[in-house]
Swiss-Prot record:
Catalysed reaction, written as an equation: 7-aminomethyl-7-carbaguanine + 2 NADP(+) = 7-cyano-7-deazaguanine + 2 NADPH + 3 H(+)
Compartment(s): Cytoplasm
One GO term (biological process): queuosine biosynthetic process
Domain of life: Bacteria
Active-site residue list: C181, D188
Gene Ontology CC: cytoplasm
EC number: 1.7.1.13
Protein name as it appears in the record: NADPH-dependent 7-cyano-7-deazaguanine reductase
Species of origin: Burkholderia multivorans (strain ATCC 17616 / 249)
Binding site residues for substrate: V80, E81, S82, H220, E221
GO MF: preQ1 synthase activity
Record pathway: tRNA modification; tRNA-queuosine biosynthesis
The UniProt record lists the keyword NADP: yes
Keyword Oxidoreductase among UniProt keywords: yes
Amino acid sequence: MNPEHSPLGKATVYASQYDASLLFPIPRAGAREQIGITSALPFFGTDIWNAYELSWLNARGKPQVAVATFYVPAESPNIVESKSFKLYLGSFAQSKFDSVDAVRDVLKRDVSAACGASVSVQLVSPHDFGKLEMDELDGLSLDRLDLDADVYEPDPSLLSAAEDEAPVEETLVSDLLKSNCPVTGQPDWGSVQIHYVGPQIDHAGLLRYIISFRNHTGFHEQCVERIFLDILHRCKPVKLAVYARYTRRGGLDINPFRTNYNQPMPDNARTARQ
């Protein structure tokens, strides 16, 4: 489905009852073709969605609330457009469910169907809200660099690495990632973590490259995949992982993770800006 046909940027009618048809899938293939991915994926990973505005009624009509986390595999053929996800979750508000498990099962079934792959779902109930963590992405901050920047569309030529020197292992972070919704033009603010093993990447060039997304239009997942591929092609690391955490909109935050080597799932602790 085309993003222009999604609920984004259109007048909204909020459903009063649960409605799975509100979910609007968008194929990943189109955006991947634009960055040269036409066959096997050069990465694997997950999109971590956190939903903070989920509520439903129990069997006796009493409202219940939870924080939901969805783990969408990067190999799924579709993503779900975020406003449609918000409207879908909102449709639970006046619908009765017998248990938390019943809600989880419905969420897993519907979102998996929309994405075209098995999606894991976790629900955190209010008595466990205090266990939810807040933390910043770990790594050496690129934002410490005092530099000039004047490129605000993605430019891979800003990236370079010392290929004639000994390889290094580094984790680098920046809070200066900003892109824009391809439908509404609204800004998407994010933090990004880049872990790699290979020729040392020029830090100033990498920061300028991250800044260059400032006027770019693309969904969160697409931006992270572009960053991953550009670093992979320009800097030639042996191992590479890119993880971004975007600020919340409509009660949802989206946190794409891409890697080309086996490692544990990244921490889902929300950052201060989320």
